[in-house]
Amino acid sequence: MKNTYTSGELEQFFSSDLSSTDGAVQVAIDLEEARQNQQIELIASENIVSKAVMEAQGTVLTNKYAEGYPGRRYYGGCEHVDLVETLAIDRAKLIFKADFVNVQPHSGAQANGAVMLALVKPGDTILGMSLDAGGHLTHGAKPAQSGKWFNAIHYGVRKDDMRIDYDQVLALAIEHQPKMIIAGGSAIPRQIDFAKFREIADQVGAILMVDMAHIAGLVAAGAHQNPLPFADVVTTTTHKTLRGPRGGLILTNNPDVAKKINSAVFPGLQGGPLMHVIAAKAVALGEVLEPSFGAYIKQVLSNARVLASTLQQRGCDIVTDGTDTHLMLVDLRPKGLKGNTTEESLERAGITCNKNGIPFDSEKPMVTSGIRLGTPAGTSRGFGNDEFELIGQWIGDVLDGLVANPEDNSVAEQKVLQQVQQLCLRFPLYS
């Protein structure tokens, strides 16, 4: 039955689509959709969500305020959003074998902030991985809130193999007696030994927090050790390898920690949860529970190995000499290149990545000596080993062109761009 409105203004408000009401925003969205269709996405922290996830996020749930938690809200009319949030919680519990899950954090950074608000106090010592070694801003980097509010000490990697220096972690923990130790990061290409971190935390009586934002999809598929049996608390994003909407989760098996976390998220750090995003999280987590997700992660890892191997054959230096995960770091110093100019050249060739500091990097953060590459988005698109071998060759062509013609690499860029666009036409995104 067609709705009847009492005025033309109301009919327009409830019936007009975006293209007819705000052409400027529609144009920007269309341009971004075209970019995603026509470029190969290798940013390791990005992925491509399903149409169902996008549909859930663009629903009437965006209208609903729901401060509090299921069954304990500060507003009426929450019975249906309670169902949605409970679905998200139960699915996350099942995936990660967690007793308690908070699905309300708006981002991974806010999930980390809520954990710190709950479990440590300003001035306490925290021990996390340094940003240049592969850590994350929220783990105590100076520009971040965690670096300003806490006495942040940082561990790094060994110079000989660029892997986490667990001996240094132990030595720093004994020396500084941190209240919290943080494991995880944003550019760690090898598996993390959470059991080792637990041993170190126990030696000094520290809380162990694991940030598994990058590897949550791997953990969900059984392709990486689950941190839950070892950590006091675990945080993650819901995008990246989980292939959901942008958002965060906090997980724990400790009921006392769970109570503190819930209070820290609301009312401590956030107000009303984003129920439309939580619905999208629930849908994405439902997809993770399907057998096809395990096959997807298996392909992500296989593609990463192929890409790393191809780049090595093209003379690239891969940090840690390979990858166990979905990402890799390319050290550009042997080629005499910088991360920023390489990122720009690759983007002109239709390949999107990000400049990234490498361990012991002497360049500024906006310059860097490396790039970070990841395979989740390309794998979601349908790329397999053959496609990632081609991509590795194309990256090699762009880098070689940049070495030979640092002032104007347009010939190599245009040649690769044509090949990229032909490949992308074979693997379209949303219909």
From Swiss-Prot:
Keyword list, A-Z: Amino-acid biosynthesis, Cytoplasm, One-carbon metabolism, Pyridoxal phosphate, Transferase
Transmembrane segments: none
UniProt GO BP: glycine biosynthetic process from serine; tetrahydrofolate interconversion
Places the protein is found: Cytoplasm
Reactions the enzyme catalyzes: (6R)-5,10-methylene-5,6,7,8-tetrahydrofolate + glycine + H2O = (6S)-5,6,7,8-tetrahydrofolate + L-serine
Entry cofactors: pyridoxal 5'-phosphate
Top-rank taxon, per record: Bacteria
Known EC number: 2.1.2.1
Record's GO cellular component terms: cytosol
GO molecular-function terms, A-Z: glycine hydroxymethyltransferase activity; pyridoxal phosphate binding
Coiled-coil stretches: none
Keyword set includes Glycoprotein: no
Subunit structure: Homodimer.
Name of the protein described by the UniProt record: Serine hydroxymethyltransferase 3
Lineage: Bacteria, Pseudomonadati, Pseudomonadota, Gammaproteobacteria, Alteromonadales
Gene symbol of the encoding locus: glyA3
